[in-house]
Amino acid sequence: MLHSQKRIWKKIGLCLLSFILGITVFTGSFGSKAEAAVAGDFQVSVMGPLAKVTDWNSFKNQLTTLKNNGVYAITTDVWWGYVESAGDNQFDWSYYKTYADTVKQAGLKWVPIISTHRCGGNVGDDCNIPLPSWLWSKGSADEMQFKDESGYVNNESLSPFWSGVGKQYDELYASFAQNFSAYKDMIPKIYLSGGPSGELRYPSYYPAAGWSYPARGKFQVYTETAKSAFRTAMTTKYGSLDKINAAWGTNLTSMSQISPPTDSDGFYTGGGYNITYGKDFLSWYQSVLENHLGVIGAAAHKNFDPVFGVRIGAKISGIHWQMNNPSMPHSAEHAGGYYDYNRLIQKFKDTDLDLTFTALEMYDSGTAPNYSLPSTLVDTVSSIANSKGVRLNGENALPTGGSGFQKIEEKITRFGYNGFTLLRINNIVNSDGSPTAEMSSFKNYVIKHAKPAGDGGGNPVNSVTIYYKKGFNSPYIHYRPAGGTWTDVPGVKMPDSEISGYAKITLDIGSASQLEAAFNDGNNQWDSNNMRNYFFSPGTSTYIPGTNGTAGSIQAGPPITSSDFQALPAYEMSI
């Protein structure tokens, strides 16, 4: 009897072991599937020099070396301080036309950044290009510039509190579109500068203001214009001073007493950041950046979509220090304007902008005094972007190589990045055009993932394959190669795919860089995307309709189904 019981328990134990091993294989194969690849249209770009090119032949030799080693595009700061320096609406694009011509001769694509910030004074800056001097006569310094907690005034970029921002950017974007329409075939993407160093943030960590790493930096909303905006926002939220006092536990007697934090580090060490007042301030502080992104995004879509028909992107800074400081958690991120990444990235989606994130090469080291967690931060931001269907492009924060390229490979494959841009050209190409020692590692870990021949599945080089998760039983796709001619409404019926519940279609887009499309049921019932069309890049994508009329999402690659998982092994054990 005892022997029989022992055999039973032994069999139960082995069954449990088999189950655990099976689960391990299952989850392991799921992880490898989810982390296996970049997006189907992944390409590699390299950032050009900050300062003006003076030797065009040498520059062309550098570009040719990039082309010969698998790089897709050169990314370039198009400095506002150069092109409109002579006066309001007095543009000179001649330098950048020469630049674009040189890039074209080398066989590369060109990705311009409309750089509405100053070059000089930040990490990696080797030039001095201020904003156009005439600009400051358009309004007061209090409206147009930043002021921090200590009173330092910063004019790296225009303050989002100035009402003239939209008009100035609209004029700049319109002139660029007019002057570079003839170059549209070589421009696969356009980036917008959202603030200092081209990033959507406040100038919270600026060495000239006294900042040094790893200090938290300073809040930047101490002009009278900014403080007035905060008061207005709080009055709008609560309705009256009495209700503000009730929410904050204060005894303010005048609206003028409503103010951004005035206690420096004490805002954190005293816990102010974690009470209702602190949360209201930090949420509003970020919302100013969100509104700014909406303004510049709308101006960009208005001017660029009809001419270029390409994706437009903007960048969030990888503020990775002070993240896990027990007394001042996330304080550096907060000073830069990042309080709620989920909400911030949703604004990218709502504005139909791609997201560039930086510091992909860095490793965590979360100990004092830096409390630096860049790898964790990349994971956080990338995961949120993936969940919302926001396209991702990566960058390195500092010069890198070797293990840094390995880290980049880990991130771009784990989160299905659509592109990576290396900072900067002199990291992998010498001035004489010869490759540096880092070129080999860059090719082995990053460039090798580029998709020069479409999606790798035998489709034409410039084709788009779309899997449509059926919201409509018989979906139609109304489309055009971006900038081309639309199909007749309702478009083309999408046939069923090899995957149950999905339709599928492959479309050749010729020389266009994207497919512009909308979906319907063939009977004038249209998929809602806030009255905007969807854009698909070459390669394979999966489209998932939204619910209750909300916008759908686009994910890189084909759908992941149960058949993608390795079958669980059957374990037969003798006992």
UniProtKB/Swiss-Prot annotation:
The active site is at E199, E395. Ca(2+) binds at E84, D88, E171. It is an enzyme of class 3 (hydrolase). Coiled coil: none annotated. Pfam families: CBM_25, Glyco_hydro_14. Its cofactor is Ca(2+). Its EC number is 3.2.1.2. Binds 1 Ca(2+) ion per subunit. Keywords: Carbohydrate metabolism, Disulfide bond, Glycosidase, Hydrolase, Metal-binding, Polysaccharide degradation, Signal. InterPro entries: CBM25, Glyco_hydro_14, Glyco_hydro_14_CS, Glyco_hydro_14A_bac, Glycoside_hydrolase_SF, Ig-like_fold. Residues 1-36 form the signal peptide. One of its GO terms (biological process) is polysaccharide catabolic process. It comes from the Bacteria. It catalyses: Hydrolysis of (1->4)-alpha-D-glucosidic linkages in polysaccharides so as to remove successive maltose units from the non-reducing ends of the chains. Substrate binds at D77, H117, D125, K315, H320, T358, N396, A397, R424. GO terms for molecular function: beta-amylase activity; metal ion binding; starch binding. Monomer. Belongs to the glycosyl hydrolase 14 family. This is Beta-amylase. It comes from Niallia circulans.
